[in-house]
Amino acid sequence: MVRFCGQEACLIDANGRVKLPPRFLTDFRQDDESVVLHCLPEGALGIYPAPVWTQMRQGEARPAAKAATSILFRRQLRRFGALTQSERITNQGRITVPNPFRELLGLEPGQNVILVGTEIGVEIWNAERWQDEFQILREHERRKAELEMTADLETPGRDRSGTT
């Protein structure tokens, strides 16, 4: 079964909570109800099962040693620390989006949002921002297809620079 796929419109309630649709709730409950919220640079809130987040953040063999010598690395740690928070899915299937995250991402109580599956988790998007992002994705796919078609139609025996 494919996990964390699809998209659904939801409402942020007056307390800043989002009720997860059954399909996403089932996916999260395969691990447990412990999730990590992370504000993404694209303008969405990523929600990841805790084990997935741990995998995403692995990679630096000695983070403390690197933090001692790298301003850039400390800034990266600061960004992740400030824009990330552990959370639990309630028994009612809701997640509370922290107020600072809502303000940063334009996710207001009473507002419709879009939940988008990403195969490793779910993103919460402001509906307008999601339309903009989806347009970017569609344009990228169109351009990629045009480049592939152009490459397929090139004259045999010529490389892509036009030389033989």
Predicted regions and their residues:
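Flexible "stalk/tail and boundary" regions
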Residues: M1-C10, A14-N15, F24-Q92, P100-T164
